Every structure is written in structure tokens, then in C-alpha cells.
A protein has these predicted regions:
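A generic structural signal for nonpolar/aromatic side chains embedded in well-ordered alpha-helices
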Residues: 19, 64-65, 115
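Extreme N-terminal tail/first-helix region
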Residues: 1-21
């Protein structure tokens, strides 16, 4: 669908900046009963895909992904309410794609390391040790990006 407010469209470089500086976003999936399900998740954008991690359990998120791999991921940054003029400043990205569970152990480890480097750069060594001790307890989810859109108001 085409964006209505063309004056607020952000380019790919701005979208990537949003993804790289954001700590979390909302991953939205579709359930077996066709109900939407959105869950906040931290993530990393690496090599053109988005990686997430979660407990190695079959809850709503994972069962939805197994049922239907189509998903949407939304990130919002730089929010500044302007109550006196009934407006808001923001930058946002909406990513569409297909999500799967990463089965390859090398890719899984690489994704977890990228998440640690992004979200805990001051604890890299401890993070790598934590990954080695706990990677069997988590799923890494991979979103193959099919479309990215960005919108903002400065």
C-alpha cells in the first residue's frame, strides 16, 4: 500500500539508522485463528535481516511463526510530544517479511553475538560467555526482509 503522507517518507538510509539505534520494536504475527499478535522484542539488524531471540518454548509467538511465517516489525524513535499544537515528532520504520527459526548453529551464535554487541557493548566478554553457556536454551528468529518503509516528522 502506498503511503499517504509522501512528505514524511524516510529513505533506506534513515530506516537503517532507526533500526541500528533502536533497542526494541513490536513483532506482529498471525495466529492459527487469524488473530494478530504483537510482542515487544529486542533485535539486531545484521546482513540485511533482522534477528530476535526468545526462550526455547512454543508460546504464541513461536507457534504463530510456525503456522504462518508472514510478519511485520515496527520500531518508533525520537518521539517528542507537542501537546500545545496537538502533534508529535517521531521517526518510525515498518518492516515486512518472513520469520523462521534459525537452525544453523553458526548463524545462531553469530546472531546472538550481534545482539550482545548492539545491546550490551560494555559487556562483550561476559556476553560471549553467557551465549556459550545458554544458547541451547533459546531460539533465534530470523526475519527475511521483503519490504521496509519509514515515516517521520521532525
Amino acid at each position: 500500500m502506498e503511503m499517504r503522507r509522501k512528505d514524511r517518507i524516510l529513505g533506506e538510509e534513515e530506516i537503517l539508522e532507526i533500526l541500528n539505534k533502536s533497542e526494541y520494536g513490536i513483532l506482529s504475527t498471525i495466529g492459527i485463528d487469524n488473530s494478530p499478535y504483537g510482542v515487544p522484542m529486542n533485535f539486531v539488524y545484521e546482513d540485511g535481516v533482522i534477528y530476535f531471540h526468545c526462550a526455547k518454548a512454543i508460546g504464541y509467538k513461536v507457534s504463530n511463526i510456525i503456522y504462518n511465517s508472514n510478519a511485520c516489525f515496527t520500531v518508533v524513535n525520537d518521539i517528542c510530544l507537542q501537546p500545545e499544537i496537538f502533534s508529535i515528532k517521531y521517526s518510525s520504520a515498518i518492516i515486512f517479511g518472513k520469520v523462521s527459526i534459525v537452525e544453523d548453529e553458526a548463524e545462531k551464535k553469530k546472531a546472538l553475538e550481534a545482539i550482545v554487541k548492539k545491546l550490551s557493548p560494555e559487556n562483550i566478554e561476559a556476553g560471549m560467555k553467557y551465549i556459550d553457556n545458554n544458547k541451547s536454551k533459546v531460539y533465534v528468529l530470523k526475519m527475511e526482509v521483503t519490504e521496509m518503509t519509514g515515516k517521520g516528522k521532525k
